[in-house]
């Protein structure tokens, strides 16, 4: 026993040594101090230099730890340098591009989202468009690659010769849009720009060089090491308290009480760094010229910029800069911003607390008049957040019959269309299915589809609205007439005004009654030129306001003004003092001004994840959206409640993230009020054909019927079917078998055997109930708590118990797992067809087991599809079965992959196969023990004084008895004697 304890102590010592070694390695490799220094410099140039040097330490494609460290570092940089402030800085744009390229190593879809964000916000840089086009070209999307480059010319991205070179290379069929020489020239140009315009000493004086003054140069650099003069509270406010969860405009200047918000892109920079002596307008466009005279600041060391933006006059911008000449003025300004923000949050909460959907609609409508959501990304995100708060307070099932609620649903969908038309289509479908009694809901959806070029669907929506008896019918008839006449606007503005005038008057009356003191101020507040009806017309989704329209709401307003003058609350989806967000997670329309939005999905440390609209507290998100099937252990729903929810039969579920999509369906990870996690499959029946709708309904029927028969079928807890959508509330797993196999080079024998049994049991269950799957593949199985479960029925077909096979009018299945009989032509009477049966599922399962054994499918090495089909059905083509130690496994593989289905083994036989049976060891014959042996053992036990020693000796004796071995008295005595020396 001494040896055992000694061995245990040695193991503990070894573990401690290992931990110390890991800590030492971590200490040596820890770049925290360096990244902190780079971030504290407030210089994208410095941060990019640090990240470039960090990447040179290895190969991110081959080193996951380096890739993770790089992603974390980019995350921290983007958290501290919001996109809205630095998007016009060249180094920042290059960091966005490189981040997207690194994301492509992890997830192509996330990389595409990151490229979209970079292109929509840094559209003046040609290299951003070229990098995105290169990414799409490598994915094989030639058409999208061409479109991106064409859009870059339309956006007047510079330098133009880079775009021209990329187009030339694309037309000549080259895989690289920019040659190595072109990239070097681009890098040298950027380096000259950075070095020539950087301050030469620590006096914060800017030395403009010839390079900086050159007309082709777009931006002055960001300062690196300006002395920072700010209090601790101001540090905290800048770093954390004003971090906006959905929009990375996290610094005070974009949260001011001024209504110009994001339109004043340069002046806020002075405010954000108001306690540091630095040059103003560090990211000014090339259209701005540098003045030689200096501003009359107390220090006299900062240059003013003669800014001539198209929206805000230079005088207005300079006046705003001059307000911050003294620290006292800046402190007062910061305090006003903080007070205004508190009042804004309180104001929206007060409106919601009135339990009036009419009041909420009036507030949101008036709020929207303060800026243009089409061109102001920050304002758009705040509007969406306000709508989300309203919907969270007023459940859809209870208020869908209210006109004001229906109008809010419609306007929310229209605003979502600016960010993501796909999400907007879903929101329109939800609004139309729940508020079908209102004609304007159907017309808005039809207008949205018409604006996307789907005139056929627009007609279908209006026809269904007529059949559903939506009111007023006159509006529908007008919309149909306008559609048939070829007009792009289904309803003129006067129709919108007349249909809503009565409702608006009632809302205004309610507001005057609730806010009698503020009513005069509402009257005085100047609004934009947008008419009261204009906001409801879906066709205006892609409208960009003119500079004249945008000037109207620029006038600063007091923080104590009415609802019209109240700033939109920061979209605090979580704890407002802790949330840190960065450019993130959308799949935006390339033609829209896209807010870098986190789709409310929880972030996994070092590998940030693609939800759906959920962001965790105190963890910065990165500009990407990785769809992670693994739930982070530290993330709890209680700390991350989402404002986006799904209601299924009156029960509300909050969206974590989207974990999958395909065709007309999407799968979300959700949780309820009790923090139970589920998966919700949403199917948009508007986009599905009749056959797809029928297959979805069959899937629900099968799942619902088979719940009681097997634990290897995914659990279906509830579902809701309407004419326009389907909700399926199901069990949520960790990851599918296909992903699990992709992440492993080899599979452990015990895991393979356990998963094989799970698959057989699941398929055996559906076969017993007359269901043939006919498209089994690893992606059809989900790992839930260490067990495999069948998650769908593919192209499942129910057959009668006395029928062995059925005929299909086309070949079905996935080729690498498709049985020969499903490929062979069994046409009759000139009608093509193929045969499927339960034995076909056995072949598919055999291919999965083959993949788990050899790391590939039987015919995976044949790349030509025609040759692969011939090999599958050709009996003379022998399937390779390399020798393996498990002979029973080899026998299973050979019997599953028999081309003749009649000779192929059945599921029932596979369950009884020796491969799945435990191989019991022959039990040893019990040996007789003499009475003298017992006597010696008992005497030895009596001689022991220590209770621990007696217990150990008795334990050894029991182990000998249970093992069936003959009792070794000397061994027992030896063990007992050893304990006496302890």
From Swiss-Prot:
Residues 178-204, 211-230, 493-574 are annotated as: Disordered. Residues 211-223 have a biased composition (Polar residues). ATP binds at residues 659-667, 681. Residues 510-533 have a biased composition (Basic and acidic residues). Residues 653-916 form the Protein kinase domain. Barely detectable in adult somatic tissues. Expressed in immature germ cells that have not completed meiosis. In ovary, expressed predominantly in previtellogenic oocytes. In testis, expressed in primary and secondary spermatocytes, but not mature spermatozoa. Disruption phenotype: Mutants show anomalies in the chromosome number of male germ cells, leading to aneuploidy and severe developmental defects in their progeny. Transmembrane segments: none annotated. Keywords: ATP-binding, Cell cycle, Cell division, Kinase, Magnesium, Metal-binding, Nucleotide-binding, Serine/threonine-protein kinase, Transferase, Tyrosine-protein kinase. It catalyses: L-seryl-[protein] + ATP = O-phospho-L-seryl-[protein] + ADP + H(+); L-threonyl-[protein] + ATP = O-phospho-L-threonyl-[protein] + ADP + H(+); L-tyrosyl-[protein] + ATP = O-phospho-L-tyrosyl-[protein] + ADP + H(+). Changing residue 783 to K: In zp1; temperature-sensitive mutation that blocks fin regeneration at the restrictive temperature. This is Dual specificity protein kinase Ttk. The gene is ttk.
